[in-house]
Curated annotation (Swiss-Prot):
It comes from Streptococcus equi subsp. zooepidemicus (strain MGCS10565). GO terms for molecular function: rRNA binding; structural constituent of ribosome; tRNA binding. Gene3D superfamilies: 1.10.8.50, 30s ribosomal protein s13, domain 2. This is Small ribosomal subunit protein uS13. Keywords: Ribonucleoprotein, Ribosomal protein, RNA-binding, rRNA-binding, tRNA-binding.
Amino acid sequence: MARIAGVDIPNDKRVVISLTYVYGIGLATSKKILAAAGVSEDIRVKDLTSDQEDAIRREVDTIKVEGDLRREVNLNIKRLMEIGSYRGIRHRRGLPVRGQNTKNNARTRKGKAVAIAGKKK
């Protein structure tokens, strides 16, 4: 397994797919990285030469991925919560942030439904 940005990428898959195992690299970014590194998208990871691996690593190092990206996203959310914006309040309360309705659904964000005790007979 080749190690790129601290992540072991699978050997048996094509390079363009294997790169998407790194947090912050999707299919489009993966294709851009390979084009800049001059590596074919169809080659398998196990068939890469060490020079090609190094070229891919250099290109990945120019992009914010893994820990740095996660930290930036968390700091952005924390900043929204500190300034008290609407989005920050929704994050703090654990509700949907992007305008979805919460009357019926939103179970993923709100968590498991808590039963309210009904009237006893």
